[in-house]
């Protein structure tokens, strides 16, 4: 048999059938996985370095939080002073304002004004708070009723302040020590 040479002229043979494939996501993923399986290990050369995102992720895991702190550190340790009772204690004005704005006390006072009888515990609470308010107002000078009595308690001291030096000398000369025996 003699050999027949193939010719490349159009129309000689039937037209090649063009097959178009619709590639799905699954096909694309399977090809990528196959490519990764073939290429195990690291890429050759320094120019094929890891991506920056992966490097940052690895460095973040290894980073020690104690290293690189910008917070200033005191070289001399000062002993912390505990706050004293006076520093923790409220001033008279603050305590008075707090008692005057006490919601529970106001409700109980309204109940008393309406003629309702309170229990012994609540009545005791109201009495204590009102006594404390009165005491604080007296300390702050907001109550004028009690102050004149305290001043008049020692009238001889008030008179001595008004005397002159000559009067005091005369009183000293007339002083009798036998009165105190």
Swiss-Prot record:
One of its GO terms (biological process) is ribosome biogenesis. InterPro entries: YihI. Residues 22-32, 55-67 have a biased composition (Basic and acidic residues). The keyword Ligase does not apply. It comes from the Bacteria. Pfam families: YihI. Residues 1-73 are annotated as: Disordered. Keywords: GTPase activation, Ribosome biogenesis. Residues 33-42 have a biased composition (Basic residues). One of its GO terms (molecular function) is GTPase activator activity. A GTPase-activating protein (GAP) that modifies Der/EngA GTPase function. May play a role in ribosome biogenesis. Belongs to the YihI family. Interacts with Der. This is Der GTPase-activating protein YihI. It comes from Aliivibrio fischeri (strain MJ11). The gene is yihI.
């Amino acid at each position: 048999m003699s050999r027949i040479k193939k010719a490349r002229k159009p129309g000689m043979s039937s037209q090649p059938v063009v097959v178009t494939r619709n590639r799905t996501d699954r096909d694309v993923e399977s090809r990528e996985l196959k490519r990764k399986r073939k290429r195990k290990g690291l890429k050759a050369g320094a120019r094929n370095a890891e991506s920056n995102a992966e490097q940052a992720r690895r460095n973040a895991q290894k980073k020690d939080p104690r290293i690189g702190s910008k917070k200033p550190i005191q070289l001399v340790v000062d002993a912390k002073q505990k706050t004293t009772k006076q520093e923790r204690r409220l001033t008279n004005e603050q305590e008075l304002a707090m008692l005057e704005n006490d919601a529970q006390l106001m409700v109980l006072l309204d109940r008393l004004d309406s003629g309702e009888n309170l229990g012994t515990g609540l009545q005791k609470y109201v009495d204590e708070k009102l006594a404390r308010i009165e005491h604080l107002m007296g300390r702050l000078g907001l109550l004028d009723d009690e102050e004149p009595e305290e001043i008049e308690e020692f009238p001889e001291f008030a008179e001595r302040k008004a005397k002159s030096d000559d009067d005091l000398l005369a009183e000293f000369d007339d002083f009798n020590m036998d009165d105190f025996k």
